[in-house]
Swiss-Prot record:
GO molecular function ontology, one term from the record: L-malate dehydrogenase (NAD+) activity
Entry keyword set: NAD, Oxidoreductase, Tricarboxylic acid cycle
Task of the protein: Catalyzes the reversible oxidation of malate to oxaloacetate.
Gene name as annotated: mdh
GO biological processes: malate metabolic process; tricarboxylic acid cycle
Record's protein name: Malate dehydrogenase
Residues at the catalytic site: H188
NCBIfam families in the record: MalateDH-SF1 (TIGR01759), PRK05442.1 (NF003916)
Lineage: Bacteria, Pseudomonadati, Pseudomonadota, Betaproteobacteria, Burkholderiales
Length: 327
């Protein structure tokens, strides 16, 4: 028997990431090749014509799984009964804009969206915040939606995770799919800490294979952390297709499970690994039955603790910067 369609809300639908994302969702890459979807697309009033153009293209693909499309500039329409919400749209940093101003501008957007989700979304909605600063935006949305379970709100660390995987694959000369138990701690920012101390390839330790702390500290971590800036430098535009791909990976694994594989998700802490509760933090997780679970019992050495503290301090500063807006 055919499955009932799932409602997928996407904000910033007319943007670059949206354009890379929507066709793959409609093709079944995110929720499975047997799962019909209804896309509920949100963007600003001035972007509605552009969204209509994207929808014309979606129609022209004749995707068998695309059961319907809603176009709106009203969050309460976009999030109505949503099973999955991808919050992609965010205020980008303009020239001369202080980080504080960026945080405040986005806090307003994500407060409104959190409240709308709280009012109209499915009680089981899975929310992924892609728009930057993703961790803090996810925290704001979560805090603005008190009637939804806090674990329904997540931030995207999967792009950092995938970037780190590809760097390790290149360094070891091994296929990217053979690398297991590599993950990322912290904020989706250059302070994130990609950790391969437990990673293996075909059962062999990646740390032993690479055996180069200088490469780890001076090449690997900066390359992964500043990859977004390097892409803007090279392409003149920010990474859109790779961000969309990471969003697909994140939701796919959350909904359909990881089969024991460890991945990275930004999730609200319950105090695990000494991270203050409610902090939206990148953790190693496994997913099964539509739920994620933090990998427990990992030893944190002094170097790793130092790196985790740096990214945590940045997140705490961001959180403090928006606290007054949350009432």
């Amino acid at each position: 028997m055919a499955k009932a369609p799932m409602r997928v809300a996407v904000t910033g639908a007319a943007g670059q990431i949206g354009y890379s994302l929507l066709f793959r969702i409609a093709n079944g890459d995110m929720l499975g090749k047997d799962q019909p979807v209804i896309l509920q697309l949100l963007d600003l009033p001035q972007a509605q014509a552009a969204v209509k153009g994207v929808v014309m293209e979606l129609e022209d693909c004749a995707f068998p799984l695309l059961a319907g499309v809603v176009i709106t500039d009203d969050p309460k329409v976009a999030f109505k009964d949503a099973d999955v919400a991808l919050l992609v749209g965010a205020r980008p940093r303009s020239k001369g804009m202080e980080r504080k101003d960026l945080l405040e501008a986005n806090a307003q957007i994500f407060t409104v969206q959190g409240k709308a989700l709280d009012e109209v979304a499915s009680r089981n909605v899975k929310v992924l915040v892609v728009g930057n600063p993703a961790n803090t935006n996810a925290y704001i949305a979560m805090k603005s939606a008190p009637s939804l379970p806090r674990e329904n709100f997540t931030a995207m660390l999967r792009l950092d995770h995938n970037r780190a995987l590809s760097q390790i694959a290149a360094k070891t000369g091994k296929p990217v799919a053979s690398i297991e138990k590599m993950f990322v701690w912290g904020n989706h920012s250059p302070t994130m800490y990609a950790d391969y101390r437990y990673a293996t390839v075909d059962g062999k330790s990646v740390k032993d294979m690479i055996n180069d702390p200088v490469w780890n500290n001076d090449v690997f971590l900066p390359t992964v952390g500043k990859r977004g800036a390097a892409i803007i430098e090279a392409r003149g535009l920010s990474s859109a297709a790779s961000a969309a791909n990471a969003a697909i990976d994140h939701v796919h694994d959350w909904v359909l499970g990881t089969n024991g594989k460890v991945v990275t998700m930004g999730i609200p802490s319950n105090g695990e690994y000494g991270i203050p509760a409610d902090t939206m933090f990148g953790y190693p997780v496994t997913c099964a039955n539509g739920k994620y679970e933090i990998v427990k019992g990992l030893e944190i050495d002094a170097y790793s603790q130092e790196k985790i503290n740096i990214t945590l301090n940045e997140l705490e500063e961001e959180k403090a910067g928006v606290q007054h807006l949350l009432g």
